C-alpha cells in the first residue's frame, strides 16, 4: 500500500467528498479527505474525517475524491 495523496489540492484548499460519492455511500457533510493510499491498480483506500469521526473506504475509481465542481481529483502526489 502506497500513499498517493493527502487532503489538500494544489492551491491548499481542503479536499471535500463530492456529491456523487456522498450519495453512493450515504455520507453527509462535511466529510473531508485525510489521506489516500493505492492498494492495487485502480483501487484506492480513502481515509475520510468529519469532526472526531473517521472512516476508511476502498474504491476503484480515482474520481472518488473531488470538489463538487470536479476541480480536484488526487492532489499532492507523494
Predicted regions and their residues:
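Intrinsically disordered, low-complexity segments enriched in glycine/proline and serine/threonine
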Residues: 6, 35-38, 63-66
Amino acid at each position: 500500500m502506497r500513499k498517493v495523496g493527502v487532503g489538500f489540492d494544489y492551491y491548499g484548499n481542503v479536499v471535500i467528498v463530492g456529491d456523487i460519492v456522498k450519495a453512493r455511500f450515504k455520507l453527509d457533510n462535511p466529510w473531508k479527505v485525510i489521506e489516500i493510499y493505492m492498494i492495487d491498480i485502480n483501487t484506492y483506500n480513502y481515509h475520510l474525517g468529519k469532526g472526531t469521526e473517521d472512516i476508511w473506504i476502498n474504491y476503484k475509481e480515482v474520481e472518488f475524491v473531488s470538489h463538487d465542481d470536479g476541480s480536484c481529483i488526487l492532489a499532492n502526489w507523494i
